[in-house]
A protein has these predicted regions:
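PEST-like low-complexity, intrinsically disordered acidic/proline/serine-rich tracts
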Residues: 1-148
């Protein structure tokens, strides 16, 4: 969940036995079992997450990445540990630690403070040529307005 230029919102939903992490960019939803079950043996694109609580911190550990989405050069050996801690009413501290001995000599950690968003999360949608279609879309809307 590295920040990008836009679409950085994250929705965190807690349900019985699960936490769901929904990112606005690409609109990916990661369903995190919280019941202590073992990791699934097969690899998957986003890895296999498992979560637990350490005091007031949500900890999500993901393994079993299939290598289709390499993170900074990592591959199938990637072990990702994410920590979510509420530090104030409007701030969530997000820390992630990346381990992959085939790429790095030691694990490394990043800390990002996430602020509460008062706005809505929008569907991530794009299409080819959208920079050229805006004038046509607006022109069509103005035509309809004039001819009502």
């Amino acid at each position: 969940m590295m920040p990008t230029v836009y679409n950085n919102n994250v929705l965190i939903v807690q349900a019985r036995g699960y936490v769901v992490l929904v990112t606005e960019m690409i609109h990916n939803a990661r369903i995190v079992p919280m019941d202590g079950r073992p990791h699934d043996p097969g690899p998957s694109m986003y890895g296999d997450p498992r979560g637990h609580w350490e005091a007031d911190t949500l900890v999500v550990e993901s393994v079993g990445f299939d290598g289709r989405l390499p993170f900074r050069g990592s591959g199938r050996s990637l072990h990702l540990t994410e920590r979510f801690t509420r530090t104030s009413d409007d701030t969530l501290e997000y820390r992630f630690t990346v381990e992959d001995a085939t790429v790095w000599s030691r694990p490394w950690t990043v800390r990002i403070d996430m602020g509460r968003s008062a706005g809505l999360m929008y569907e991530f949608a794009c299409h080819e040529g959208n920079d050229r279609s805006v004038s046509g879309i607006l022109g069509g809307a103005r035509y309809e307005e004039r001819n009502r």
